[in-house]
């Protein structure tokens, strides 16, 4: 049995789906407020639901019964949308409990090491780094291309419009969440000890580079606007809750760029990663609103 936390987010769902496709038993911890459509989508994979809060010992024991490993996606590139939650106390309780048990493998996906803008995601990453867990794998995932190159984050490619954060010239090694989920699964069964891996895409590209890729694919010129660094900082400063602040913090980091982390090798888990060029080629583009 594999316990997956953060199953209400895009990455957590993909981990559950892939594990079930391999015939693996999966227990998915989900928040009680999870939207019905996500519940049904996750239920269709055949996972075992575990909606109980993890703040008390009885719930933790029940969640970890017959579990061989935990894959935690709570502190990854969240929130994808405002409806998602991040229960830091539950995440901490589970991590500490698996450490006490000693025999469980703990695999956590979190934000890159270079991120410095304070948020619950960065704080959780730092706690993972400081945890003396006997069998822990930390996966530092770069920006998810499926999230940041979407209309919800200002990249409205179906209508050839792009709102770039900052000057758009800073490079990031964007990665597919599908590749991240596959690497997390391939880490299962690894021997004890602490391992850290950087999950970066194969290319360091700026937001302006990405716009050019889409313009070439669509044969259209994008209308490009920019959100200044001052405006991004103001959004962060006025954030009223941890989730909103985490979203604003990620925008600041996106504007700064996040090139590949050359100090942490991924060679021990060979996988042909999705390039941005390949990702763009797979997208279906809606026709322009004013087309005949």
Regions inferred by a protein language model and the residue ranges of each:
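A hydrophobic C-terminal alpha-helical subdomain
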Residues: 18, 187, 229-292
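Short, acidic/polar
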Residues: 95
């Amino acid at each position: 049995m594999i316990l997956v936390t953060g199953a209400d987010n895009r990455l957590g769902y993909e981990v559950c789906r892939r594990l079930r496709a391999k015939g693996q038993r999966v227990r998915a911890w989900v928040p009680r407020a999870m939207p019905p459509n996500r519940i049904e989508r996750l239920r269709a994979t055949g996972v075992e639901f575990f909606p109980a809060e993890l703040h008390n010992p009885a719930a933790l024991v029940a969640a970890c019964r017959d579990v061989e490993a935990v894959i935690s996606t709570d502190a990854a590139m969240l929130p994808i949308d405002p409806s998602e939650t991040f229960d830091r106390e539950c995440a901490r309780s589970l991590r500490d409990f698996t450490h006490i048990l000693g025999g469980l493998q703990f695999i956590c996906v979190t934000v890159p090491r270079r991120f410095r803008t304070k948020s619950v995601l960065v704080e959780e990453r730092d706690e993972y780094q400081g945890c003396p867990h006997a069998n822990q794998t930390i996966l530092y995932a770069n920006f998810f291309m499926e999230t940041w190159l979407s209309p919800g984050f200002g990249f409205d490619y179906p209508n050839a419009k792009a709102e770039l954060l900052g000057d758009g010239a800073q490079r990031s090694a964007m990665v597919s969440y599908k590749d991240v989920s596959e690497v997390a699964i391939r880490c299962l069964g690894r021997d004890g000890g602490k391992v850290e891996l950087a999950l970066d895409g194969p290319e360091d590209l700026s937001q302006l580079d990405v716009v050019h890729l889409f313009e070439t694919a669509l044969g259209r010129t994008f209308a490009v606007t920019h959100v200044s660094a001052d405006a991004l900082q103001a959004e962060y400063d006025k954030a009223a809750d941890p989730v909103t602040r985490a979203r604003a913090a990620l925008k600041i980091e996106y504007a700064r760029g996040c090139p590949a982390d050359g100090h942490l090798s991924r060679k021990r888990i060979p996988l042909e990663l999705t390039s941005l060029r390949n990702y763009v080629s797979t997208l279906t583009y809606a026709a322009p609103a004013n087309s005949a």
